[in-house]
């Protein structure tokens, strides 16, 4: 059986730990990928010793439909990111991956952080 792939993204700096907690809660048999926006990256780098990949790397393998992700979770999802996804704007890795999920009819879960 093919290993399932899940993409988790964080687009809100104040809730980057929520995205990481989701990664921790996913079963070990799932292949996990994590994306974060620049603000999320700044907060995480200050709070941990992790090196994070750039949200501007729109050519990353997970930005392609051929990558075959089964689902994507954006938690937290800023209103800016939600609006870009709703309007079809794919100008960074998070929004590009979300666009691919919609195009491929895959699960896309958005967890807004403000209303």
Where are these regions (language model features)?
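A cross-family phosphate/adenosyl-ligand binding-site feature
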Residues: 2-109, 113-115
């Amino acid at each position: 059986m093919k290993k399932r792939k899940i993409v988790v993204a964080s687009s809100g700096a104040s809730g980057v730990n929520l995205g990481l907690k989701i990664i921790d809660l996913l079963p070990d048999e799932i292949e996990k990928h994590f994306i974060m926006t620049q603000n999320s990256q700044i907060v995480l780098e200050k709070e941990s010793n992790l090196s994070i990949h750039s949200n501007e790397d729109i050519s990353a393998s997970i930005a392609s439909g051929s990558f075959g992700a089964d689902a994507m979770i954006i938690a937290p999802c800023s209103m800016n990111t939600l609006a870009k996804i709703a309007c079809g704007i794919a100008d960074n890795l998070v929004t590009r991956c979300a666009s691919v999920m919609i195009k491929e009819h895959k699960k896309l879960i958005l967890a807004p952080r403000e209303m």
